[in-house]
């Protein structure tokens, strides 16, 4: 499968750089915490993803990002252009 992932953050704008968080930092965290574990892998073999539905993938990503990305507000995972799931840490 090929998934598209959207990461959303919420917070106050930093007066030093006018960002809530620099997208380069988000990208770096995503690549280190998520991408290297999922890219070109058989998802069923990954701990916690024995049933890799978009719902479960979004929760798995949330759980692996939240400690590194405390401003995380949503993780959306799409399979194709039209169908996906958004997890908000509920």
Language-model features: where?
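Charge-rich, low-complexity N-terminal segments
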Residues: 1-90
């Amino acid at each position: 499968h090929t998934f598209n992932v959207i990461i959303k953050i919420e917070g106050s704008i930093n007066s030093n750089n006018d960002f809530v968080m620099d997208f380069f930092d988000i990208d770096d965290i995503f690549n280190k915490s998520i991408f290297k574990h999922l890219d070109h892998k058989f998802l069923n073999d990954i701990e916690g993803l024995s049933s890799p539905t978009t719902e479960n993938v979004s929760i798995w990503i949330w759980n692996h990002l939240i400690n590194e990305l405390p401003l995380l507000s949503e993780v959306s995972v799409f399979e194709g252009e039209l169908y996906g799931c958004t997890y908000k840490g509920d």
